[in-house]
Amino acid sequence: MQQLQNVIESAFERRADITPANVDTVTREAVNQVISLLDSGALRVAEKIDGQWVTHQWLKKAVLLSFRINDNQVIDGAESRYFDKVPMKFADYDEARFVKEGFRVVPPAAVRQGAFIARNTVLMPSYVNIGAYVDEGSMVDTWATVGSCAQIGKNVHLSGGVGIGGVLEPLQANPTIIEDNCFIGARSEVVEGVIVEEGSVISMGVYIGQSTRIYDRETGEVHYGRVPAGSVVVSGNLPSKDGKYSLYCAVIVKKVDAKTRSKVGINELLRTID
């Protein structure tokens, strides 16, 4: 694996000079191998090690290199044709392979090659970009988008129209991460490498980036870039220092544990916020 990483790191340093026409065989094979390993879930761009999320930057570099070494090509779809550098993940799947891998894909959901989809996942008409990882038992609902290299945990529900930000455009240092057992409400956006920790519930229409203030109304604490585990979050506003105007924020209205979540439905958690 170290040898593979070394090839990727070396190629990335000279990426400006690499084209589909002049890329060397060693680099092409290394990039293709990484994309295949990401696609199968054998590798992932970020993983939790000793309780901390670690981003493997060299894997992200391999994803970026894949755009340098490949020409656009025609991609056939059921209702149309497309023209892109990245093949679709399910282009060569037959019924037996879908059954073996154990997830459902509802048309016209689109998943790029290099994204991993785990067992018991349901993809409604949605989009999952290259390098993303969607873990077991999760639902990517209609018109939701999982951005490049984003990490989605087990038993996560991404509601209709949710946007989970990617790292490639614009280039971000770390992927956006939604940990296990989270619920992200309709039309919410989580971007710029924000981490939503385990068991959190994000209400409809909440927008969280690195500069968004995440205000805990019980403690008065303000978080940036991280939603603490077990938080129930709604959109809100905080006053300016001079009191003349207010600015958008996300508000943690309560904290819940796994026991409470198992007994209380998501809708009830969001409706009883006073």
Curated annotation (Swiss-Prot):
The keyword Transcription regulation does not apply. CDD domains: LbH_THP_succinylT. GO terms for biological process: diaminopimelate biosynthetic process; lysine biosynthetic process via diaminopimelate. GO terms for cellular component: cytoplasm. Its main location: cytoplasm. Transmembrane segments: none annotated. Pathway: Amino-acid biosynthesis; L-lysine biosynthesis via DAP pathway; LL-2,6-diaminopimelate from (S)-tetrahydrodipicolinate (succinylase route): step 1/3. SUPFAM superfamilies: Trimeric LpxA-like enzymes. One of its GO terms (molecular function) is 2,3,4,5-tetrahydropyridine-2,6-dicarboxylate N-succinyltransferase activity. Keywords: Acyltransferase, Amino-acid biosynthesis, Cytoplasm, Diaminopimelate biosynthesis, Lysine biosynthesis, Repeat, Transferase. It comes from the Bacteria. It is found in: Cytoplasm. Substrate binds at R104, D141. Its EC number is 2.3.1.117. It catalyses: (S)-2,3,4,5-tetrahydrodipicolinate + succinyl-CoA + H2O = (S)-2-succinylamino-6-oxoheptanedioate + CoA. InterPro entries: DapD_Trfase_Hexpep_rpt_fam (IPR005664), Hexapep (IPR001451), Hexapep_transf_CS (IPR018357), THP_succinylTrfase_dom1 (IPR023180), THP_succinylTrfase_N_sf (IPR037133), Trimer_LpxA-like_sf (IPR011004). Homotrimer. HAMAP family: DapD. Belongs to the transferase hexapeptide repeat family. This is 2,3,4,5-tetrahydropyridine-2,6-dicarboxylate N-succinyltransferase. The lineage of its organism: Bacteria, Pseudomonadati, Pseudomonadota, Gammaproteobacteria, Enterobacterales.
